Amino acid sequence: MTIINLIRSLLFNIHFFLLTTMLILIMLPCLFLPFYFIQMVAKIWSFILKIGMKIWLGLEVKIDGNNFLDKTVIYAVKHQSAWETIFCTGLFNMPTIIIKRELIFLPIIGFYFLKGGSIPINRSNSLDSLKKMSKMAKKAIKKGRSILIFPQGTRVPVYSSTRDYPYLPGVFFLYSQCKIPVVPVAHNAGLFWPKNSFIKFPNNLKSKTVTIKLLDEIPIGLNKNDFLKELESKTEKETNIMIEKEI
C-alpha cells in the first residue's frame, strides 16, 4: 500500500460518508412521503458512490446484461463488499432487499431501510425466520418489486471457498415459495473494496473497471439440490473469471 493509495482512500471515504450523511439528513422528509421518494434517495446514493469512485479512485462501472431490469425477479447477488448493496439498490430500481436484522437499528438509516420495504431477518435460517421472509417477499412481488438477496448470507473474501461460505438454503426457500426466476449476479467489487476495509485498492483492478454481470436466469421448478448447484456454479464461475482478468 502506497501513501498515494492511502490519500485516495481517505478522500473517497470523506466524499462518500460526508455526502451520505448530508443525503440522509436532507431527505428525512421522504420518510413521510410516498415510496417513489425513497426510490429517488436510493438512486442518488448509488450516484454518489459511482462519482466518488470515478473522481478519487479512477474507477468506472460496467454493467453487463441488463435485460432483466424491467422484470420482477429474485436477484441473487454475490456479496464481497458494501459496494454491491449500495449500487444494486439504485441499479435494480429499488428492489426489496433481504437484510440482516441489525441494520434496521442503525441510527436514521435504519428508518430508510424500513421505509424502503427491506426485509430484516435473523440469519439463523430457522424455519420461522424463513417463513416470515417469504411472506413479506410475496407482498413485495405482488406490488411488482423484485427481491435482492445475498445467497451466502454475509460478505465473503474474494478468494474464499464455498466450503467455508456455502450458499445457504434461504435463497432456495425464497425461490420455491415465490415462484419467480432467480437471476445470479456476479461482480469483482471485492478486489477494490474488501470487507470492513477503510483502505480501497483501485490498483487491484487492472482494467480500472468494476464489472457487474447479470447472468442467465434460473427458471422456476428446480429441486433444492439442482437449484443450489446451478446458482453456485454460475455465480462462482463468472466471479472467478472476472477476478482472474484483473490479476
Label every PLM stretch briefly.
Residues 1-73:
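Membrane-anchoring hydrophobic helices of lipid-metabolizing enzymes
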Residues 20, 24-40, 56, 71-126:
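Catalytic core of membrane glycerolipid acyltransferases/transacylases, capturing the structured
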Residues 55-62, 130-131, 194-197:
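Short gly/ser/thr-rich secondary-structure transition/capping motifs
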Residues 63, 119-122, 220:
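Short acidic-hydrophobic, aromatic-tinged amphipathic segments that line or gate anion-handling sites
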Residues 108-110, 145-148, 159-226:
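A cross-family acyltransferase "interaction/gating" segment
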Residues 118-141:
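A membrane-cytosol interface segment of integral membrane proteins
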Residues 151:
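Short acidic, glycine-rich surface-loop motifs adjacent to enzyme active sites
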Residues 155:
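Short active-site segment of divalent metal-dependent hydrolases/proteases
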